[in-house]
Amino acid sequence: MSKPLPSALNPLAKALLIRHSLRPRHALSRIGMGLALSSALVFQVQAQEWTLDIPAQSMNSALQALAKQTDTQLLYSPEDIGGLRSSALKGRHDLQSSLRILLQGTGLRYQIDGNTVTVTASAAAKDGQIELSATNVNSAGLGETTEGTGSYTTRVTSTATKMNLSIRETPQTITVVTRQRMDDQHLGSMNEVLTQTPGITMSQDGGERFNIYSRGSAINIYQFDGVTTYQDNQTRNMPSTLMDVGLYDRIEIVRGATGLMTGAGDPSAVVNVIRKRPTREFKSHIQAGVGSWDYYRAEADVSGPLTDDGRVRGRFFAAKQDNHTFMDWYTQDRDVLYGVVEADVTDTTVARFGIDRQTYKVNGAPGVPIIYTNGQPTNFSRSTSSDARWGYDDYTTTNYTFGLEQQLAHDWQFKLAAAYMDVDRDSFSSYYSTTTNRSYLELDGSTEISAGIVTAKQHQKGVDATLQGPFQLLGQTHELIVGYNYLEYENKHRGDSGPDVNINFYDWDNQTPKPGDDEIIPGIQYNISNRQSGYFVASRFNLTDDLHLILGARASNYRFDYALWRIGNEPAPYKMVERGVVTPYAGIVYDLTNEQSVYASYTDIFKPQNNVDITGKPLDPEVGKNYELGWKGEFLEGRLNANIALYMVKRDNLAESTNEVVPDSGGLIASRAVDGAETKGVDVELSGEVLPGWNVFTGYSHTRTEDADGKRLTPQLPMDTFRFWNTYRLPGEWEKLTLGGGVNWNSKSTLNFARYNSHVTQDDYFVTSLMARYRINESLAATLNVNNIFDKKYYAGMAGSYGHYGAPRNATVTLRYDF
């Protein structure tokens, strides 16, 4: 136990009192006072710069390393830093910027007095000191947590390798959408966030069924706080793309193959969603918004200590949203609840338990028929919808999460995370029939409307455990991580139908009789069970001060059970088991300067798939290789990140639609396996603070996927995308005003209909948006967002025989009060 100190003393006096009154060696041992002393005092230490290399580790070891490498005297108390972990520090820095980076996000503050630095924990900043709470991070020292930083980038990310590396140190393309950017752009759902990311595109098959693509493949792996979940793109039970993002701190997107950490999956991307965590100091806000089409939203977020000593902390978030839309008879209703408790079980152990529940209820359905039976494209009003007024589609998603972080000796760390997800879907709609490569709409408007009833239950369990830390070899410090993760996914999906109704689509006014229980026709049952587990090991070898090599491998076991049958018939189950599948990973990073690096990486691809052939049998696993090389820059002490990447993906057994319906499948489209498929592309991105007060996020992406004969695959997706968004806080007497705006551009996309020797093309288009925020006082701010200011009409996504219009010009006003 540390000796209590008079609370009236300032941090420097407190530290010096400890130093002088507890000078005997045995007393220092008994008290556990952390004291790092230099052998000589150096004057003007604040102005001096050093080339530093301090990996992320326990705060005690990081401060000792800083004292040694800068020849500086550091004073601190173990009870202030117990259980805390530093950020990584690398490059050339002065003492002040070094402290800001190491201490960011910890609630610690520092005071420099000549060659002596005192580090303490405190509830409030005082004269001559800088407060670095978990939600008030000085922009010169960013860390993982983005909330409260005002930044469009982050200093540390672990999604790609599970190691705490900067974006520049990671040999893959990483995009981070921070809390500030989500607030500035008024991004409310996961699909809104992802479609604002360069290289990410969308198709929509009707209703609330989003397919999100990256590098030519659908994204089907989503992580929540690093625990992997699976999204089935066949049954379209896709809760991950519909999630409200109000409870998240940031969203990290690692593009390309990530099999080392996630196991089976496409070489598209992994989306890691990081929830907000409790803060050591009280903070809260309430927020209300109104907007176009009767948009109303209210939310509250409260966080802080639950005990006097702050060792137990909690956070609660709630949101309610109701809105109509630009489409007739189509409304949305969201309810979000999130609670989490975090505790310092010991000075080196942190445990966390949280629950979040989201309900998403929709009346009606978006989308319009995109082509007539004669092959002529349609041109409906954006207000047109294709569902009866009584149609609905309801999702309820509940997540239970647990986390444990244990600091070990010699700067090693053990982490354990577990999650359970439960999803219920209930849908009853009357929809315009959609089938790939076929239209059911005559030129005179006559067509059939079919009632569809879907019930689905999805359960997922996930565990992720890692042990990591530094080790010495050949005079250099290296990082090693070993781990295990497990995923169990079950999805039971039943689809029934009602009698077809003949209507005229031009004047049906979205009204048809709702089928009674005695009119329901049994349809199909579709069950999937997917279990995978794997052990992985990876190491970051610092071969020289400038050359870093990451080598890793994963050994995985898979079991995939699949059954599709018409109700009343006997199921025909299919099972695939793979054991000991090895996925290698290699990445190399060379530091050109303290701010710029070049890199190259390689990994294997393995993905069991539920795309089926004409007999209903799943295709063999997709296999391949992923190559990437690029350049990265980290400027202005990490406040600005830039990257350029070139990539190539080679795959066999890639599923391609045959446009044929599998017999007795309820409309399931058959696929064929394509060998020799190749995807090539480039990603360019810039994010962060370009100048004081000026935040920018921009990026360009090009991708093209071809089969072995050079034929382009997925032409319904744009090959090129450009995203730009920026905000500027005005200086001087206008400092209360922040202005922002941006533009999204997608290149041409084409949906082909071979049956009619026809196609539907969406030409390239721009969508422009603006925002303005005025800070009324220190606590209250008002924000105006205007989207699609030029009211561009365009298809945001095309699939099957449906098109989905992007929203017309719209506006929201949000009022936020921070306590």
From Swiss-Prot:
<dbReference type="Pfam" id="PF07660">
    <property type="entry name" value="STN"/>
</dbReference>
<feature type="short sequence motif" description="TonB box">
    <location>
        <begin position="115"/>
        <end position="122"/>
    </location>
</feature>
<feature type="domain" description="TBDR beta-barrel">
    <location>
        <begin position="281"/>
        <end position="819"/>
    </location>
</feature>
<keyword id="KW-1134">Transmembrane beta strand</keyword>
<dbReference type="GO" id="GO:0009279">
    <property type="term" value="C:cell outer membrane"/>
</dbReference>
<feature type="signal peptide">
    <location>
        <begin position="1"/>
        <end position="47"/>
    </location>
</feature>
<dbReference type="InterPro" id="IPR037066">
    <property type="entry name" value="Plug_dom_sf"/>
</dbReference>
<dbReference type="InterPro" id="IPR000531">
    <property type="entry name" value="TonB-dep_rcpt_b-brl"/>
</dbReference>
<dbReference type="GO" id="GO:0015344">
    <property type="term" value="F:siderophore uptake transmembrane transporter activity"/>
</dbReference>
<keyword id="KW-0675">Receptor</keyword>
<keyword id="KW-0798">TonB box</keyword>
<comment type="function">
    <text>Specific receptor for the siderophore ferric pyoverdine (pseudobactin) 358.</text>
</comment>
<keyword id="KW-0732">Signal</keyword>
<dbReference type="GO" id="GO:0038023">
    <property type="term" value="F:signaling receptor activity"/>
</dbReference>
<keyword id="KW-0812">Transmembrane</keyword>
<dbReference type="InterPro" id="IPR039426">
    <property type="entry name" value="TonB-dep_rcpt-like"/>
</dbReference>
<dbReference type="Pfam" id="PF00593">
    <property type="entry name" value="TonB_dep_Rec_b-barrel"/>
</dbReference>
<dbReference type="Pfam" id="PF07715">
    <property type="entry name" value="Plug"/>
</dbReference>
<dbReference type="InterPro" id="IPR010916">
    <property type="entry name" value="TonB_box_CS"/>
</dbReference>
<protein>
    <recommendedName>
        <fullName>Ferric-pyoverdine 358 receptor</fullName>
    </recommendedName>
</protein>
<dbReference type="InterPro" id="IPR036942">
    <property type="entry name" value="TonB_rcpt_b-brl_sf"/>
</dbReference>
<dbReference type="InterPro" id="IPR012910">
    <property type="entry name" value="Plug_dom"/>
</dbReference>
<feature type="domain" description="TBDR plug">
    <location>
        <begin position="166"/>
        <end position="276"/>
    </location>
</feature>
<dbReference type="InterPro" id="IPR011662">
    <property type="entry name" value="Secretin/TonB_short_N"/>
</dbReference>
<feature type="short sequence motif" description="TonB C-terminal box">
    <location>
        <begin position="802"/>
        <end position="819"/>
    </location>
</feature>
<dbReference type="InterPro" id="IPR010105">
    <property type="entry name" value="TonB_sidphr_rcpt"/>
</dbReference>
<dbReference type="InterPro" id="IPR010917">
    <property type="entry name" value="TonB_rcpt_CS"/>
</dbReference>
<keyword id="KW-0408">Iron</keyword>
<keyword id="KW-0998">Cell outer membrane</keyword>
<keyword id="KW-0813">Transport</keyword>
<comment type="similarity">
    <text>Belongs to the TonB-dependent receptor family.</text>
</comment>
<keyword id="KW-0472">Membrane</keyword>
<keyword id="KW-0406">Ion transport</keyword>
<keyword id="KW-0410">Iron transport</keyword>
